Amino acid sequence: MTTTVAFIGLGVMGYPMAGHLANAGLSVRVWNRSGEKATQWASEHPGAACDSIALAVRDADFVMTCVGADKDLIEVFEGDEGIIANAPEGAILIDHTTASAGIAERLAESAGARKLAFIDAPVSGGQQGAQNGALTIMCGGPEQAFEKARPIMAHYARALNLMGPAGSGQKTKMVNQIAIAGLVQGLSEALHFAEQA
């Protein structure tokens, strides 16, 4: 039986990530805030564009999200038309948005109350990594759900790690960003010193 995946959010990262899933032979349904983007995606890949989140996630085994920030996550996950209210019991929800650990913990709790598993899974590698299927994904959530989701995410990831419970993926991404910022600052100061020497 074919695995069904709903992919919510077709920005510069989500668009190619959803494409990798469709090209791997999974049954993919997409939704995007601007419907034209979803229609365009469906014209280029084997898969279907949906008019609502509820339609996209109905009967999905996995629901992937890749949106802007915390407020966008609240919009797509919560409410009567959101993911949590409409995904089938037992579905695994995987969020690739770079957001706060707090929102990840909140969504994990809400999902758990409906017998859904939630994994916060922010990505590193940028647009090129998404296009090449070479992202690094830092995950937080239940181990059993992670192991089920691993082969799905592997279609667009080079490295996948479970860092701990809900929120751990986001915390790890923050550590990564701090390390990169420190490296950039150090290089900048070194170059400035070299120019002055």
Regions found by a protein language model. Give the residues of each.
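NAD(P)+-binding Rossmann beta1-loop-alpha1 motif at the extreme N-terminus of oxidoreductases
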Residues: 1-65, 91, 96-97, 127
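Rossmann-fold dinucleotide-binding core
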Residues: 5, 98-178
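Aromatic/hydrophobic pocket-lining residues that form π-stacking "cages" and hydrophobic walls in ligand
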Residues: 38, 107, 190
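Rossmann-like NAD(P)(H) cofactor-binding subdomain of soluble oxidoreductases
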Residues: 53-58, 62-63, 70-135
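Anionic-ligand binding region
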Residues: 150, 172-178, 182-197
